């Protein structure tokens, strides 16, 4: 069994990379691939770069050349669910693009031509994430829709647009839908497990940059627990 793990930024993959043994590094097309083992599980850790195009390029190479049995997307996200606070975890049930609009041709908002409106996370991987969560004392998590776009959502106007068109959204970020769409086309199961680095409509004394290392720690701990359960 081989697990693909994807994070966009160096900060989001650093803790996982440090835990790897027998690691080999390959740089290709602006992406960095670390192959080795974590806690006895064979993994390929991808640092894709930020945004949907970078994520799609990296995921395509990951699936085509390394052929993992599953994909875990880790890192940070912006919270939209009112119960979420900094450091909480979100687990995807489905993923959608929030910045795609071909509704003029009869598609749903967020749906790309020829693609499903939503990319459904794998049920077994969602349950695995829930089991991992049970082993993390006091870690709060919400399970639901995660939306992706090539923008850091920080204006009231964009937040309102997303809430209007995707009322069940729990979090937003910048890579997951590209990863999910690529996994869908390769028929590889995926789940998104991220930690909240900022929350819409909630003031925080910490900025995104300040909280990112803590979000990376929370999401990495979830991945570690999931890998332990896979052994």
Swiss-Prot record:
Catalysed reactions, as listed in the record: S-adenosyl-L-homocysteine + H2O = S-(5-deoxy-D-ribos-5-yl)-L-homocysteine + adenine; S-methyl-5'-thioadenosine + H2O = 5-(methylsulfanyl)-D-ribose + adenine; 5'-deoxyadenosine + H2O = 5-deoxy-D-ribose + adenine
Signal peptide bounds: none
GO biological process, one term: L-methionine salvage from S-adenosylmethionine
One GO MF term: methylthioadenosine nucleosidase activity
Keywords carried by this UniProt record: Amino-acid biosynthesis, Hydrolase, Methionine biosynthesis
Catalytic site positions: 12 (proton acceptor), 198 (proton donor)
Known pathway: Amino-acid biosynthesis; L-methionine biosynthesis via salvage pathway; S-methyl-5-thio-alpha-D-ribose 1-phosphate from S-methyl-5'-thioadenosine (hydrolase route): step 1/2
The organism's place on the tree of life at top rank: Bacteria
Positions bound to substrate: 78, 153, 174-175
Single GO cellular component term: cytosol
TM stretches of this protein: none
Enzyme class: hydrolase
Keyword Amino-acid biosynthesis: yes
EC number: 3.2.2.9
PANTHER family reported in the protein's UniProt record: 5'-METHYLTHIOADENOSINE/S-ADENOSYLHOMOCYSTEINE NUCLEOSIDASE, 5'-METHYLTHIOADENOSINE_S-ADENOSYLHOMOCYSTEINE NUCLEOSIDASE
Family: Belongs to the PNP/UDP phosphorylase family. MtnN subfamily.
Family annotation (NCBIfam families): MTA_SAH-Nsdase (TIGR01704), PRK05584.1 (NF004079)
Function description: Catalyzes the irreversible cleavage of the glycosidic bond in both 5'-methylthioadenosine (MTA) and S-adenosylhomocysteine (SAH/AdoHcy) to adenine and the corresponding thioribose, 5'-methylthioribose and S-ribosylhomocysteine, respectively. Also cleaves 5'-deoxyadenosine, a toxic by-product of radical S-adenosylmethionine (SAM) enzymes, into 5-deoxyribose and adenine.
Entry protein name: 5'-methylthioadenosine/S-adenosylhomocysteine nucleosidase
Organism: Vibrio vulnificus (strain YJ016)
Lineage: Bacteria, Pseudomonadati, Pseudomonadota, Gammaproteobacteria, Vibrionales
